[in-house]
Amino acid sequence: MSMFCYQCSETLNGKACTVAGVCGKDPETSNLLDLLVWVLKGISFWATEARKLGVDDPEVNLFVAEGLFTTITNVNFDPESIGKKIEKAFALRERIMKATKEAYKEQYGKEFSKEVPEAATWYVPGDLSVWELKGAEVGALSTKDEDIRSLRELLTYGLKGIAAYTDHAYILQKFNDEILHFLQEGLAATLDDSLTVNDYVALVMKAGEFAVKAMQLLDEANTSRYGNPEITEVYTGTLPGPAILVSGHDLLDLEEILKQTEGKGINVYTHGEMLPAHAYPELKKYKHLVGNYGTSWYNQQKEFAQFNGAIVMTTNCIQKPLESYKDRIFTTGLVGWPGVKHIPNRTDGGQKDFTPVIEKALELGGLEEKPGKKIVIGFAHEQTAQVADKIIEAVKAGKIKRFVVMAGCDGRAKEREYYTEMAKRLPKETVILTAGCAKYRYNMLDLGDIDGIPRVIDAGQCNDSYSLVVTALRLKEAFGLDDINDLPISYDIAWYEQKAVAVLLALLYLGVKGIRLGPVLPAFLSPNVLKVLVENFDIKPISTVEQDLELILQGK
């Protein structure tokens, strides 16, 4: 076995990737990422001990979040870049360890004597080959008990999603140290062999609580800078002229690209999870933000090859770039791929310098005109609140009989055609609530509207599942219900990676029951852990469209 990874929905044969990742990860990259997570756990051990002594290190706190984000599926495939992260992790671990020991001695008059896990001390100087070997030792399989392993991985993947949302918020200057501290609490707990199954279940539920907080923080970050999303029509065709395509999730990167291209005759397009950017007033004001090109991440090799412009990957999801466009794709932030040009991070409060991207776009000459339809987006919670009376009236009049939450991720699996078919076959009295790239399975279908309310209400990116939760809670209040599960809402969720795990844990924390999860159940859930989720939350796998549709319409 060269590697072991089962953190995403596409893991090989629904079990694990052990020779190479379906995502494109080679064993070296996979094992280095496992080592990075392990060292982050070691940092977290010291950081949680330090806070008990009144010591807190903001740089360490944020680094743990950035490090976790780096290990999410389809973020960083570059061993050298990951190696630099590991080197910095060792340095910060040494710093917080020293600060902890000094504070302990000052407070208690003796040396720190608590048992220290290996992850908090192991170090071999910068050698990727040695680090790779160590990474292979300390991954998921290092926990022998199947149920403890399952819960530790469920917790860790939830923490990765929380870290991603929190990191995005911090980039936009919205801070919540409590979330960063919980990331460390959770990571440190995975090193504690004294914890029981019940202890880990409690931590998993606590992760759901902090997933809600992280999504709320990012919602505040996005809306305070760019305004509340508005109902907006987005063009899906192309216009003639030089072009830049921005994929990923980072709105600040898009904003800086828009600023730096203003007046240069370059059209800017979004791709994938950047589609919701068009709904924000402070982004849609740029006239050269002209449309959304393509669909979700897994189609990028075909779509990028046909896009004769510069391409910027701001966060996940990147796939192996084809030679046909490798010289015109750029990574930035935490994203990395060997041999792909990288736009460095901001320094001294300035902007990133996207000059190489702009020059490449101008050099290429650009796109030809190609017609496309318009799609409607922008139904985040504030915008939805403005049409709430209309929605409530439609429900009371029987014109809307059920809402179906079909949020989450898209992916390559043929089984995901289920979501397209479900959208087509849902009766005209149903409304789909969506967020995340799962929307691309049905957002180009002509599903019509109900008294002017679109039958696909798109709240935004995957983190904007928070908006769907807020909307559901407002509807519960409006209808005078005691339980969110009494609403005429069914949950038919598609998952792919670790941010979706965080969203799932958030829904469970809020008490949502009866979630259908597809296209497959996570491989990292042991039979016993799955049994707990089924018994307590009625989680179930998707079945056939015919069977699930019948049950959904019955509220089951």
UniProtKB/Swiss-Prot annotation:
Lyase recorded as keyword: no
EC number: 1.7.99.1
Transmembrane region(s): none
Cellular location(s): Cytoplasm
Keywords, sorted A to Z: 4Fe-4S, Cytoplasm, Iron, Iron-sulfur, Metal-binding, Oxidoreductase
Protein family according to the UniProt entry: Belongs to the HCP family.
Protein name in UniProt: Hydroxylamine reductase
Species of provenance: Kosmotoga olearia (strain ATCC BAA-1733 / DSM 21960 / TBF 19.5.1)
Lineage of the species this protein comes from: Bacteria, Thermotogati, Thermotogota, Thermotogae, Kosmotogales
